[in-house]
């Protein structure tokens, strides 16, 4: 395995506060492997004179070679200038990230254990190379981005920034390749106002901030928009005959970016000459055009293609408290954080989706958290046959005293798939963490707690 990383950059000052910078980086990875699998003869017992028959079907040698190239180029125009109490900053740039991966493997079966050459499984004579295969793999992606940012601050009191990205991904068709993703943020250091002089002098610092932006995701396979065919025979029933065919995976040409709108508002406050710091954030996210693959019954014959379907939201809040104090040679402090978040599926066109993972069924359903646990509620245990006769039981099941009693949700007298409930989800509502640190004359003590 060979790995090479190289970076080259150059920067030129145009005028005071304005500079141009270029960066080129490369990662080159080469992987070469030669392997041999050989069956080993063994004897049934210590006294046996004839070895057991050896299955030579898995005897083979293979030669694997792969090359990966990641090239990153950037051209950035930076500006930063202060005029009295005014500070202006800006950035314009274009970037490209290109990835190329090629691999091939040649494999021959029935290899000689010593020489690694092809042999006949019956006679052991060299020269039979009928059992051979070759594999080729290619993966190429490219992401080009035009980006910009403008920032302004006044007297270390008011802050504002606008930024954008205009991204084009080779994973999408040329008509749907580009996405525009802007963001804006504002800040106000309230403690710098004249009417807050008493607060600043006696209490500490106070800052309000908010932001809004749109993020994009291209989390799909390189060729998911294409209908692809596999290079193997796939036999299937056609009437009373078995015929051969070729496996395929459907593609969708109008795939485009998944988009997430984010909103945040927060407060930063400090007390007792910055010994105590408190932060609070509220966030809201709404994701649209989610890139996912719908689940269909196996009778459809193949998987559905990746698609922009569904919409969901995530919202919550977080508070953090940090306190540090030093008394002589003793320094100690703690930090505490508590957060709450909740997500739910807003739209999932066409149908619900139920999947089974490690014996647990999960469901995507509008109005509930993503991949909620889905199943039956219990109501204790059956105590007698009389209770069993008077209760709903699973269809086709045999029940006896001591078995679990399930809730008949729709009161139809039987327990079936219509009696399932949303049982919960894998996302805890509340999470917390606590850290304490103590140091004295080179001795340190710390502890960390977290939970949900």
Predicted regions and their residues:
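Aromatic-residue-lined binding/catalytic grooves and analogous aromatic/hydrophobic interfacial grooves
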Residues: 234, 384, 434
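Residues embedded in well-ordered regular secondary structure
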Residues: 10-13, 386-403
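Glycine-rich, aromatic-lined ligand/substrate-binding cores of catalytic
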Residues: 423-452
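Acidic carboxylate motifs that coordinate Ca2+ or other divalent cations, activating on Asp/Glu
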Residues: 412, 416
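Extracellular/periplasmic, surface-exposed regions of secreted and cell-surface proteins
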Residues: 1-37, 48-375, 438
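Glycine-rich, charged/polar anion/phosphate-binding loops
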Residues: 249, 359-363, 419-423, 429-434
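Acidic, divalent-cation-chelating loop motifs in proteins
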Residues: 406-410
């Amino acid at each position: 395995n060979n790995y090479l990383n190289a970076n080259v950059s150059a920067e030129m000052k145009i005028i005071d506060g304005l500079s141009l910078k270029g960066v080129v980086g490369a990662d080159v990875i080469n992987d070469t492997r030669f392997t041999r699998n050989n069956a080993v003869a063994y004897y049934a017992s210590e006294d046996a004179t004839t070895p057991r028959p050896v299955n030579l079907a898995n005897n083979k040698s293979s030669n694997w070679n792969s090359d990966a190239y990641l090239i990153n180029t950037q051209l950035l125009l930076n500006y930063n200038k202060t005029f009295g109490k005014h500070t202006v900053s800006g950035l314009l740039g274009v970037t490209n990230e290109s990835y190329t991966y090629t691999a091939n493997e040649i494999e021959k079966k029935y290899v000689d254990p010593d020489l690694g050459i092809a042999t006949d499984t019956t006679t052991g004579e060299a020269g039979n190379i009928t059992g051979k295969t070759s594999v080729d793999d290619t993966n190429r992606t490219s992401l080009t981005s035009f980006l910009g940012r403008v920032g302004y601050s006044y007297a270390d009191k008011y802050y504002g920034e606008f930024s954008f990205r205009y991204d084009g991904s080779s994973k999408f068709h040329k008509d749907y390749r580009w996405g525009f993703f802007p963001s804006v943020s504002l800040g106000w250091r309230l403690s710098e106002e004249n009417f807050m002089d008493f607060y600043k002098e006696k209490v500490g610092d106070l800052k309000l901030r908010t932001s809004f932006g749109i993020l994009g995701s291209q989390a799909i396979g390189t060729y998911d928009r294409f209908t692809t065919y596999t290079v193997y025979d796939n036999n299937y029933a056609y009437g009373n005959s078995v015929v051969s065919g070729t496996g395929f995976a459907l593609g969708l040409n109008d795939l485009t970016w998944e988009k997430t709108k984010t909103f945040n508002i927060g407060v930063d406050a400090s007390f007792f000459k910055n010994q105590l710091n408190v932060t609070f954030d509220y966030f809201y996210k709404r994701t649209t055009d989610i890139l996912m693959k719908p689940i269909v019954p196996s009778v459809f014959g193949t998987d559905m293609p990746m698609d922009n379907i569904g919409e969901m939201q995530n919202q919550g809040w977080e508070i953090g408290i940090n306190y540090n104090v030093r008394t002589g040679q003793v320094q100690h402090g703690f930090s505490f954080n508590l957060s709450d978040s909740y997500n739910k599926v807003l739209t999932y066109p066409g149908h619900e989706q139920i999947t089974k993972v490690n014996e647990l069924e999960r469901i995507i359903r509008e109005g509930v958290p993503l991949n909620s646990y889905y199943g039956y509620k219990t109501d204790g245990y059956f105590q007698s046959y009389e209770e069993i006769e008077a209760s709903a039981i699973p269809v086709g099941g045999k029940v006896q005293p001591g078995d679990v009693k399930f809730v008949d949700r729709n009161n139809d007298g039987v327990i079936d798939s219509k009696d399932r409930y949303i049982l919960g989800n894998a996302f805890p509502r509340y999470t917390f963490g606590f850290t304490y640190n103590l140091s004295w004359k080179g001795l340190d003590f710390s502890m960390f707690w977290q939970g949900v």
